[in-house]
Amino acid sequence: MAGFAAPAELSGRLGETAGDGDVVAAACGYWARRGLETGPEGVLLAPGGGALLLALLAARGGDILVPRPCAAWWLPQARLLGRAAHPVPTPAEYGGVPDPYALMETVRRVLREGGDPRVLVLGVVDDPTGTVPEPEAVDAALEAAAGCGLTVVVDESLRDTPHSPHHPLVLSPARAHPDDVVVLTDLAGALLPADWPLALARFPATPAGLTLRARTADALTAAGARPAGPLRAPAARALAEPPELRARARAIARAHGLVARAAHARATAAGAFALPPRAGRSLLVDLGPFREALAARGVLDAVDLEADLNARLPFPVHGGHRFGDPLPALRVRMPTAGLLGPSPAAREPALTSPDPLALPDPRRALSMFEAVLRDLAATEPPHAPGTGHRQDGTGTATHAGRDSRDTGTGTDAGTGTGTGGRTVEGAE
């Protein structure tokens, strides 16, 4: 529900009394409907995905590995703990999961350098690209992680956001690997409004899994991190998935998908790189092909690009450096909520319109985005055939501006390619 107001079905329950047990029982039912039988002893609640991941990493210890790029809220948790975070390239066709061979090589390198790799975080729907990794790719990453002795945390916060009802369901890796995967689901933005922080974790029903759950619960208790009482009843209702909420969720996903595909079409037609989005609420656009035109404007890296585009567009964008990308990579994440309108109230008509792209706000936002792209394309000098700009500003252009062969380098969680401690505003 990111970018939209809370429906009365949820906001009207803020004053109702509910306990953690009500939310846990609803969560068990939510997972059971997706083929993932879950007992209450394996479920843990927290006030938001960031707090839950922070506690889980504190409980497990060691370095973490993440696909590059990754969700903006993953890396800061490692930084807060003073842990090293090591980005791993993804396959060229989609994000969310690391290339298995690159993962194994990264683990070997970290071990040679004296590191302590213990946790891999991946996503079944990739934020920021909006892509969905194939189940075979997820399985390959999990097998590689198991061979490296890594604990796998799967972020399933966006699993219920496919843009089209005709797309295959997003499956949980925990169905095929029930003893090896910790499932993390941030309800804020998916089943609840984005500013209602409540998250769930499902731990394997094994001695090791339940021990990790207990240690994670201890970390949350030590931090005084408990879900806000008024959110428990709405969360339990959202997890029960009554028909009216399911219909609204489908309408929201459809609206995000329409503007995401429209922006993708405009970006690629102008010569930029972008993977076709299938789910979620964002699009990652690589403007590397316009490097010289951007340099003429003083735009040399992702920080400059973010500032330049935010001054020219009516909606916010965020530089790829906030998502673990190298600073020289000229990529930005576009939250699709901004394309639908400047406020939740302005976006609401898109849920019922037969043609949301014809509404004034989406039409204006897409038109301005297209104008910026046309300007860059018109001022970019021609390049010799077969040359272009890779994500780091050198070499040959790759599919969607990314190359799974680039193994990258590890980054210290205190420095490098994260957000630098800044909040990613509007990253809905």
What are these regions (language model features)?
Residues D308-V317, F323-G395, H399-D406, G416-E428:
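PLP-dependent enzyme catalytic core of the Aspartate aminotransferase-like
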